[in-house]
């Protein structure tokens, strides 16, 4: 089920510069964008999303994000109202309309507006999903000072639902985790299971470097299948770095030589402190620093 994306538009010359967003096939100023109060994304968090970075006005890892979007939709038995080619065209048009050099494109697809509140899924033949995209300008995205200073994380219990591999908009607990970190004077939080086993960060995958090996948790329903994670794994192996996919604990992370996170918006960021304890020398290590360099080099080369 698809429909063509609306024809590219130019900014109206008569109005002040305003961010242009995309809603269900239309490009509109953000203050004119509308989604029904009965939309299931709003009422039920019945929606999935993706965030794609933009460097030099081009999209980073778009095919991976599109593939994960398709998987998330399939896992929730949700049909996409747009094709991958249409989504690519919309991403590019929003980048153009909003003059994004470095930043993000946010995409969300919900199960749509059935006309009233109801727990039961609507008939997809009768109710089309809602498609929303917008950009965020982030000058200096690739030059994040945290890459040189490192970030501090705390560990918190992981009480989320069991399908963390589906990228849904159910982000209340991750948001709470970020606020817990902020109140503790840290930058982010790592979720932990019984025994202090790390699952992932609030919006990123978690890694350590120990015994000469790069370690990150293996894919399962327990963690998000990070697109940047996959790219960093591939690039590390291509660089002849030893990689191991397995669980690790907070205690092991504190005793590691290095720790870091990966995500579409952070790329690779070193973790220099966990629960107040320094990791390694307490400053960004050579492995995380090199992986960030390699990832950014490859991303710029392959961007579309």
Describe the role of every protein-language-model region.
Residues 228-229:
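Secondary-structure junction motif
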Residues 212-214:
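Active-site beta-strand-loop-beta-strand hairpin of nuclease catalytic cores
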Residues 198-204:
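Short beta-strand/strand-turn micro-motif
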Residues 1-190, 194-197, 220, 224, ...:
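Conserved alpha/beta cores of soluble small-molecule-handling proteins
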Residues 189-191, 205-208:
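Short beta-strand scaffold segments in enzyme catalytic cores
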């Amino acid at each position: 089920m698809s429909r063509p994306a609306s024809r590219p538009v130019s900014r109206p010359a008569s109005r002040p510069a305003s961010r242009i967003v995309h809603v269900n096939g239309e490009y509109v100023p953000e203050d004119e964008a509308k989604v029904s109060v009965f939309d299931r994304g709003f009422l039920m968090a019945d929606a999935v999303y993706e965030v794609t970075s933009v460097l030099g006005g081009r999209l980073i890892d778009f095919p991976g994000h599109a593939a994960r979007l398709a998987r998330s939709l399939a896992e929730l038995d949700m049909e996409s109202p747009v094709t991958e080619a249409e989504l690519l065209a919309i991403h590019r048009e929003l980048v153009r309309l909003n003059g994004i050099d470095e930043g993000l494109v946010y995409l969300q697809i919900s199960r749509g507006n059935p006309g009233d509140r109801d727990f039961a899924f609507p008939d997809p033949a009768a109710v089309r999903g809602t498609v929303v995209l917008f950009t965020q300008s982030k000058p200096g995205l690739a030059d994040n000072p945290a890459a040189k200073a490192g970030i501090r994380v705390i560990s918190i219990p992981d009480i989320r639902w069991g399908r963390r591999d589906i990228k849904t908009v159910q982000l209340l607990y991750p948001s709470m985790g970020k606020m817990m970190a902020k109140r503790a004077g840290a930058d982010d939080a790592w979720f932990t299971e019984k025994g202090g086993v790390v699952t992932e960060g609030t919006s990123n995958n978690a890694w350590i470097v120990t015994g000469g090996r790069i370690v990150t948790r293996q894919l399962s329903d327990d963690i998000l299948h990070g697109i940047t994670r996959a790219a960093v794994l591939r690039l590390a192996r291509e660089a002849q770095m030893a990689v191991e996919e397995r669980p690790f604990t907070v205690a092991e992370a504190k005793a590691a030589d290095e720790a870091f996170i990966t995500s579409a918006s952070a790329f690779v960021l070193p973790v220099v402190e966990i629960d107040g304890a320094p990791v390694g020398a307490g400053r960004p290590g050579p492995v995380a620093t090199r992986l960030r360099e390699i990832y950014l080099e490859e991303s710029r080369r392959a961007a579309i």
